[in-house]
Regions:
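Membrane-anchoring hydrophobic helices of lipid-metabolizing enzymes
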Residues: 1-89, 103
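Soluble catalytic domains of membrane acyltransferases
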Residues: 69-154
């Protein structure tokens, strides 16, 4: 719809929209994280998970709207007919751009359960984003050098 605008204006629209949307969506997730810490009992944890999944769906919908609003993208997607919505699946992608997460959420939205990503441990320190990813249960990992692994393989 707005793809005809000059790139600097599209950048501002995307940046502002993503910043506001991400901040608004992160508020309930961070509140749920506090509740999860204070009341770690099964019924409360189930409610927290439902709220977090809803927030993540809102994040994906917000991003999908922005992609449609500011881009003229023609998608050629094949293979969705074999995806089982109720089952788990592993998506393997060659990490090419910072937009991978946003694009995968957009493309698989409504077709598979909530997408979780393995994230580098250092990303947990990014304000708001890192804490939200931790709160919704995304796994973090550390990368070790070959020498360090050989020295201590545990």
């Amino acid at each position: 719809m707005l793809h005809f605008l000059p790139a600097p204006i599209l950048f501002v629209i995307n940046f502002v929209w993503l910043s506001i949307g991400t901040t608004l969506i992160s508020i309930p997730v961070l509140l749920m994280a506090l509740i999860k810490l204070i009341l770690p009992i099964r019924p409360v944890l189930k409610v927290v998970d439902v709220v977090n999944q809803l927030a993540f769906k809102c994040f994906c919908l917000n991003n999908a709207f922005l992609i449609r609003l500011t881009n003229k993208a023609d998608w050629d997607i094949q293979g969705f007919e074999n995806i089982k919505i109720n089952g788990s699946c592993i998506i393997i992608s060659n990490h090419v751009t910072w937009a991978d997460i946003v694009l995968l959420c957009h493309l698989y939205r409504g077709r598979i359960p909530i997408t979780k990503f393995f994230l580098k441990q250092s990303l947990i320190w990014i304000p708001v984003i890192g804490q939200v990813c931790y709160a919704v249960g995304m796994p973090f990992f550390r990368r070790y050098s070959r020498a360090k692994i050989l020295k201590n393989p545990k």
